[in-house]
């Protein structure tokens, strides 16, 4: 098997890259360690797409339900300071779009099933004398590729195999997320409140029938939940945000939580290997840009490869990858800092 690109990781970013390359007649395969199944989990986790990321998905034919955000109101819960952001300020119809994580992941997965190897990992890889990457899978099957794209998340398997060491820091915070019903006045507005009880964000959810459903992402210091359960913390503190928003909020899903930290690699490229999205970097969800940085990475990577192949010249893979790294690393570091 000799695909142009082998992709480690069949998540949102890896599957987007595979779909886009395949649509441009550039062969790719996806190596994914999980089983081939559509998510059975309830829709709780969401991602927020900026207009550019949504356009990238539109361009490859991904159609899923989304909620529009036209305005963001950010304010200080302890004082009177506030600031509004409107889609008018960026000459767009919408500031951003909220989609369910599972919906997006499943829609992309369906489009690349035929070129995905499930329940498989990359066991090792090396450069050969023909400037190809010799890849061995966990089932001992070989693959020869020009490019190996690491899209396998913050604990990237291929980054470890390449002995790349990330720079990491811990925010000492936990992100709590759940869905809720709320009687907010404007269904197209997202709110973010900074307070001693944490950073509380509430955004509309995709719905064809009811505009009273919202997703909540709540970042709290670990010390605040050290001596009580997350459920008890929510019960004790959500009334504070109800008063600030002048709305009633009712939790209507399970509660998910995860520790917050960031990481980045000083080099995104080594030999045939390139790190993309969360494999290369991760940031605080406060910025709401994690997935969008991943899509920007994926877009730059695909552009460089597609442009090189459309030029019908001998591909200098090291130049292609270096151009990607130059385009994306400094932009990502700006967001991290």
Pin down the residues of each PLM region:
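Conserved FAD-binding catalytic core of PHBH/FMO-like flavoproteins
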Residues: 148-247, 252-255
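Conserved N-terminal helical subregion
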Residues: 52-59, 66-161, 169-177
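Short acidic/His-enriched helical or mixed secondary-structure segments at domain edges of catalytic enzymes
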Residues: 323-337
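FAD/FMN-dependent oxidoreductases across multiple families
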Residues: 226-309, 314-318
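Active-site flanking residues adjacent to catalytic metal/cofactor-binding acidic residues
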Residues: 8, 31, 151, 277, ...
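Glycine-rich FAD cofactor-binding loop and adjacent beta-loop-alpha segment at the N-terminus
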Residues: 4-6, 10-71
